[in-house]
Amino acid sequence: FTTPQISSLGGGGGGGGGPPPPPPPPRDLISSLMTTIAVIDNGICNLRSVTKALEAVGALPRVVRTPAELTGSSAAGLVLPGVGALRDCVGALRTARLDDSVRGWIAEDRPFLGVCLGMQALFDHSEEGDVKGLGVFAGSVVRFQRPPELKIPHMGWNTLRFRQSGSPLAAGLAPEGEAVYFVHSFYCAPADPSLVLAECDYGGAFTAAIGQGRVFATQFHPEKSQAKGLQIYRNFAALAAA
């Protein structure tokens, strides 16, 4: 994506005759500026892409690797990204003792965003290597069973269909048809259908995002989804700043 330039909010003095001052930035941008968002580094995530996306929408990303660093960050929001194998993602969280930190954060309904493996890790179990997840939400992570003409992994652009109306994460996005970027062979099957924030079709419907309170997760990569993905990070930063 192209990182938008955010002009300085500072003003200068001066006499009359000059050009009129620029209009103030949108309130959501003002609210998200200087908001610290912790980003968990589990060793297998696209850390740079996520932090750059947060910077692009005016937030201050803070990379954390331990519970102490998370506490010390005084972050208003938490992002758990991940790419690769779920076993490695969950294993790294447990080794760093961040698994309890994530569960505790979510239990308090603090602003949270899981991305790709960061979404899959929240469920009870995955068919990928028979992995036990964090158990935040009841449900499983299952492998695509699709016609031979549909390649696995599901890779590339696909369109969303939002199932929860009025979700703060979807502000500024169309209810249906927004294109986002996926790379995955497994998808989440929540036990509670009301958890599904958005669906996508790939030989059949699957869960593309979940939402409950101020806790969200996406199977797709907002940081790779250009303007629409930045809107999701902008919405999350505004939610964290509220």
Roles of regions detected by a PLM:
Residues 11-24:
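Intrinsically disordered, low-complexity regions enriched in glycine and serine
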Residues 34-38:
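Extreme N-terminal starter segment of soluble prokaryotic enzymes
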Residues 62-73:
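Short acidic low-complexity segments
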Residues 72-80:
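Short acidic/histidine-rich motifs immediately flanking catalytic phosphotransfer sites
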Residues 83-157:
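Cysteine-nucleophile active-site neighborhood
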Residues 124-202:
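Pocket-forming structural segment of enzyme catalytic cores
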Residues 218-242:
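Acyltransferase
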